[in-house]
């Protein structure tokens, strides 16, 4: 079991795009994700996208430790981005290294315009990721 009470690993299923949701529905779901992470961390303030990515990276790594280094935090966020973008086939999971860290390979070029579009895409995928965690918890 991990920090979110979910068994690791999750199965990969194809991600439905945000365009199937109204903007207000997406904003509500993103707020739910932020509250889930805030509660898991026992913080008072809502986390930003970077903290959400960090927590997804830890979830995918499968273990928690106190005092992550700056480099480890960057690696965890990279793991999260790879995991989220694997829903659309941009990355493919290739396995774990000798220390148990997941590794991915880029399978296709990501064509996004600007930081805003990148952040929106990651938020959409994070919403989907947490919906999958919920579904796994309930099954």
Which residues make up each language-model segment?
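Amphipathic protein-protein interaction modules
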Residues: 68-118
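Helix-rich interaction surfaces within compact, conserved domain-sized segments
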Residues: 108-138
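Short, hydrophobic/amphipathic alpha-helical patches that form generic packing surfaces
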Residues: 50-62, 76-87
């Amino acid at each position: 079991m991990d920090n979110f009470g979910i068994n690791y690993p999750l199965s990969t299923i194809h991600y439905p795009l945000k365009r199937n949701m109204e903007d207000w529905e997406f904003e509500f779901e993103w707020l739910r994700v932020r509250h889930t992470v805030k509660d898991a961390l026992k913080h008072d303030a809502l986390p930003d996208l970077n903290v959400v990515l960090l927590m997804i990276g830890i979830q995918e790594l499968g273990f928690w430790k106190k005092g992550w280094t700056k480099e480890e935090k960057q690696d965890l966020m990279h793991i999260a981005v790879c995991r989220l973008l694997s829903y659309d086939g941009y990355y493919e999971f290739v396995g774990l290294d000798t220390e148990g860290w997941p590794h991915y390979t880029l399978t296709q070029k990501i064509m996004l315009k600007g930081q805003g579009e990148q952040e929106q895409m990651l938020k959409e995928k994070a919403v989907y990721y947490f919906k999958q965690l919920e579904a796994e918890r309930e099954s």
